């Protein structure tokens, strides 16, 4: 398959594609590049009739994914300030109306979550270590989630002063119920 920088893909003989997040030095922190690479890997898997299922896991034992890579500070959530990326077009149309289909209105975790949800192959999350923020929410649209004995999950959005992302406010209550989802998120 394709040569990636933030993930590795391994197609097993039994038709299982393993996608491994490969940034263990930063606890597999999620970046825009990782989102694009995961979407490309999912697209290729869906197009390959020999792939029967997809497993997503993280390299190393400390974390499946420790959340968004915040190493760029305020540039993390500002498309116009990101280095090495073209600024995304505005979501405001010439007449002042909002283009609600604009990708700029969707967080990167949400784009990935919807792509996982729309996968035509079963997607399994194999969690080893911490799954925090987008690391936890990317698991929600997966068909099966398997946790190792050292897996830990954190929905830390409210404690960070941000809203839950990656469609988690839609997926989480459907998995664990509204009461448990509210307790975990707030």
Can you annotate each of these PLM segments?
Residues 1-64, 74-78:
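Conserved CoA-thioester-binding segment of acyl-CoA-metabolizing enzymes
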Residues 6-8, 44-47, 107, 112-116, ...:
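Short, flexible, glycine/charge-rich loop motifs used to bind or transfer phosphoryl groups or to couple energy/partner
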Residues 58-115, 131, 161:
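Glycine- (often His-adjacent) and acidic-residue-rich active-site loop
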